[in-house]
């Protein structure tokens, strides 16, 4: 058994020497086997192991006994132990989700809090090859695609690792018996009350008896084969994502050119965009990908509402995906103004404005960097200001003779409505000198006889965070 685990660890490069690892431990055979094996590898890999247990409050005294069993085991083997109690039944009812989903969410939340608290490297989970088979069969019955057929990943985000994913339940039970681990048994796993239990207790035994005795190994092999193709598609679509998408913590924009790619790539770009925005793909299904694909084919200004208060907007063929509350906060920036000084200025905690006087003009004056601009300092009257648009604002764009309403310019620039109150403006006195990211004013441009040059550079806290 330990050889199977070592082979999996080496194959996927799961663990490095000196890693600090959180191990999710329910007290059942799978997690106790995993914890015991990692304990045996502790000295060889110089591991720091933390056992994490969640009492789901679903099985009364049995659940309390599970927690006590894991705690005592950890004391015996000198393993750090942390536990929490979460009423999964109440959580499921409150969030209108299944017990299974609620349990998974609270487990991952607890594990990640511990990871941050103790600066851990990995989170080890106790899925095995039987779990893999059950998961893939359940996904097939839901009409899954390649992502689902690939099954549970052995390693995800270089954080979540599954060292016993290639071991069977029988091998795990034999290991527990050999080492007298006396793992706890959740009696509900032996009852056909959940869909997964029916797959485990009824469907798989039926297939084994009537079609293929090795169905678990066969399904696992299929998942591994498909995973190779999935990895390539992910690699190809990731490249396209960075080519065609921009993102902030508030929204992701998919350029219209992305929708000229093969549907397999475009679909993955959409999924990647949702994942970038909300951190996961829970409640986001194939039908929502199709909805966004159809939205892009429609007219500008149209939008759809997606799960978890997310909206998608067609803006001249580009698709903007954002949280509803972002668009609902329109106008909150109108009163935000800040006088800027020579040197570094911090705006709203996440935008930095650097201002300096210079006699040199670099190549980026020709527009190569939309967030660095030069102005004739001697033409400036009044304070240098940072603000957002106001009703009645007008602007004389570079090359224009007369002024134009900011509202009309934003339409010309194809800035979607929900972003227009977030476009930064640099003003000199009462005059708008720069619509950041778009245009500078004709009135303050640098000319041949300019003596003193003002250089302004604007940076977001993260890439693409300015608007």
Swiss-Prot record:
Biological processes per GO annotation: tRNA modification
The UniProt keywords, alphabetically, are: ATP-binding, Cytoplasm, Ligase, Nucleotide-binding, tRNA processing
Q: Which GO terms describe its molecular function?
A: ATP binding; tRNA(Ile)-lysidine synthase activity
Pfam families noted in UniProt: ATP_bind_3 (PF01171), TilS_C (PF11734)
Identify the EC number(s). 6.3.4.19
Q: What class of enzyme is it?
A: ligase
**This protein's GO CC annotations:** cytoplasm
Q: What is its main location?
A: cytoplasm
**Key word Aminoacyl-tRNA synthetase present:** no
Binding residues annotated for ATP, in chain numbering? 26-31
Q: Which domain of life is it from?
A: Bacteria
List the catalysed reactions. cytidine(34) in tRNA(Ile2) + L-lysine + ATP = lysidine(34) in tRNA(Ile2) + AMP + diphosphate + H(+)
The protein's location, in the record's own words, is: Cytoplasm
List the SMART domains.
Answer: TilS_C
Q: What is known of its domains?
A: The N-terminal region contains the highly conserved SGGXDS motif, predicted to be a P-loop motif involved in ATP binding.
**Described purpose of this protein according to its UniProt entry:** Ligates lysine onto the cytidine present at position 34 of the AUA codon-specific tRNA(Ile) that contains the anticodon CAU, in an ATP-dependent manner. Cytidine is converted to lysidine, thus changing the amino acid specificity of the tRNA from methionine to isoleucine.
> What family classification does the UniProt entry report for this protein?
Belongs to the tRNA(Ile)-lysidine synthase family.
Annotated protein name in UniProt: tRNA(Ile)-lysidine synthase
């Amino acid at each position: 058994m330990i050889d199977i685990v070592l082979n999996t660890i080496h194959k996927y490069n799961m663990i490095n020497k000196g890693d600090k690892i959180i191990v999710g431990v329910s007290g059942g055979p799978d997690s106790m086997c995993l914890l015991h094996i990692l304990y045996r590898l502790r000295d060889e890999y110089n591991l720091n192991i933390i056992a994490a247990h969640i009492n789901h409050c679903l099985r009364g005294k049995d659940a309390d006994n599970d927690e006590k069993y894991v705690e005592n085991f950890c004391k015996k083997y000198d393993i750090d132990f942390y536990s929490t109690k979460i009423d999964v039944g109440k959580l499921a009812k409150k969030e209108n989700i299944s017990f299974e989903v609620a349990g998974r969410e609270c487990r991952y939340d607890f594990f990640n809090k511990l990871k941050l608290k103790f600066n851990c490297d990995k989170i080890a989970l106790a899925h095995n090859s039987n779990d893999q088979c059950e998961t893939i069969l359940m996904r097939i019955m839901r009409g899954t695609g390649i992502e689902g057929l690939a099954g549970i990943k052995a390693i995800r985000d270089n954080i979540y690792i599954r060292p016993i994913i290639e071991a069977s339940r029988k091998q795990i039970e034999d290991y527990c018996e050999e080492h007298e681990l006396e793992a706890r048994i959740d009696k509900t796993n032996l009852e056909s009350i959940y869909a997964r239990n029916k797959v485990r207790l009824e469907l798989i035994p039926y297939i084994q008896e009537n079609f293929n005795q090795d169905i678990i190994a066969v399904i696992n092999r299929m998942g591994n084969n498909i995973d190779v193709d999935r990895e390539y598609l992910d690699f190809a679509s990731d490249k396209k994502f960075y080519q065609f998408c921009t993102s902030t913590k508030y929204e992701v924009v998919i350029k219209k050119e992305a929708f000229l790619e093969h549907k397999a790539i475009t679909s993955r770009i959409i999924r990647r965009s949702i994942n970038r925005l909300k951190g996961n793909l829970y409640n986001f299904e194939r039908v929502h990908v199709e909805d966004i694909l159809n939205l892009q084919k429609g007219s500008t200004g149209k939008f759809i509402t997606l799960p978890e208060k997310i909206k998608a907007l067609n803006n001249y063929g580009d698709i903007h995906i954002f949280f509803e509350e972002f668009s609902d906060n329109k106008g909150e920036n109108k009163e935000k103004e800040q006088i800027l000084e020579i040197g570094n200025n911090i705006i709203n905690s996440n935008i930095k404005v650097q201002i300096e006087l210079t006699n040199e003009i670099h190549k980026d004056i020709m527009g190569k960097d939309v967030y660095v601009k030069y102005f004739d300092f001697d033409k400036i009257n009044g304070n240098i200001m940072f603000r957002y648009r106001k009703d009645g604002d007008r602007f004389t764009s570079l090359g224009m003779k007369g002024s134009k309403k900011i509202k009309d310019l934003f339409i010309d620039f194809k800035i979607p409505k929900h972003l227009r109150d977030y476009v930064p403006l640099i003003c000199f006195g009462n005059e708008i000198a720069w619509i950041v990211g778009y245009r500078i004013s004709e009135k303050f441009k640098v000319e041949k006889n300019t003596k003193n040059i003002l250089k302004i550079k604007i940076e977001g806290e993260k890439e693409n965070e300015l608007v």
